[in-house]
UniProtKB/Swiss-Prot annotation:
It comes from the Viruses. InterPro entries: DUF5436. It comes from Vaccinia virus (strain Copenhagen) (VACV). This is Uncharacterized 11.2 kDa protein. Pfam families: DUF5436. The lineage of its organism: Viruses, Varidnaviria, Bamfordvirae, Nucleocytoviricota, Pokkesviricetes.
Length: 91
């Protein structure tokens, strides 16, 4: 049993990182949705893989970026706090 995946190549020209992520997700989903199912079991198997792929892409490109930004922001806030405390003790 073989499935046929018809891949339509596209070039992505985006400047904004959010637009690039969304475009990439849509391109990958487009590539994996266009297949020719041979049986119901094969169809269900492909849909499970597609669900895992979408979950991975959403986590990797969107949630991970937000967590990185929050972590960086928190680190900057901590440095600012300690510099203020140190400056008060010097006076």
């Amino acid at each position: 049993m073989r499935r046929c995946i018809h891949i339509k190549e596209r070039k992505i020209h985006m400047t904004n990182i959010v637009d690039r992520n969304v475009t990439f997700i849509l391109t990958v989903v487009h590539k994996y949705v266009r297949y020719v199912p041979h049986t119901v079991a094969n169809d269900a198997h492909n849909l499970v893989h597609l669900a895992h792929l979408i979950h991975f892409i959403i986590y990797f490109f969107i949630i991970r970026d937000v967590r990185k930004k929050k972590k960086k922001k928190k680190k900057n806030r901590t440095i600012y706090f300690f510099s203020n405390v140190y400056a008060r003790h010097i006076k």
